[in-house]
Amino acid sequence: RDRDDFVRSRLIGQPVPEFSLPPAVEGKPGLASTDLSDGKPQLVNFFGSWCIPCRAEAPQLAALAAAGVPITGIALRDDPENVRKFLDQYGDPFTRIGADRDGRLQVLFGASGVPETYLVAPDGTILLQHIGDIRAEDVPELLRAWKDAA
C-alpha cells in the first residue's frame, strides 16, 4: 500500500502520552514515557514477533543502532518467549523494550499497525512518524532527522 493511504498520528508535535510498560523480555528494561524525555532524541519502534514486515526491517534498525541512534522497542500483543526468539533470530537493536500486551499504548500513540516508528525529541515531543517497515532507502532520511533533532 502507498504510505499516503495510512492515517497519520495526531500526536506529531505533541508530547508522548504518559505510560509505563513492563519489560517485554527478561534482562532488558521496560519502558516508560519518562524514558523518552531524557535529553536525547531517539526512535520508538512498535513491533511484533508475529509481524513479517518487522523481520524485513531488522537490518535497517541494526544499521541505525550501529550509527548511534538509540532505539526503544514496544512489543505489541506478544509474549516474552516469542519476543526473545525474534530478537535472537533478527537482532536486538533496542536499548529497552516495553510490553504493550493489550495494544493500549499503540492506540494512544495513534499507530495504525506494526511496524511503526516514531522519532521523539530530547524533551519527549513526537517529531516524526514512519508508517510501515523501514527500508534501506529510508535509513539516511531517518538518520538525518535524528541528527537534526539533537
Task: Describe the function of each predicted region.
Residues 1-22, 150:
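N-terminal targeting signals for export/organelle localization
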Residues 55-91, 100-107:
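Structural microenvironment flanking redox-active thiols in thiol-disulfide oxidoreductases
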Residues 18, 68, 94-95:
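A generic structural signal for alpha->beta connector loops
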Residues 19-43:
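A short beta-strand-turn-helix
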Residues 43-44, 71, 117:
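Hydrophobic beta-strand anchors of alpha/beta hydrolase catalytic cores
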Residues 39-42, 47-50, 113:
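Short pre-active-site segment immediately N-terminal to redox-active cysteine/selenocysteine motifs
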Residues 88-93, 100-150:
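Thiol/disulfide oxidoreductase modules built on the thioredoxin-like
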Residues 49-56, 116:
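C-type cytochrome heme c attachment motif
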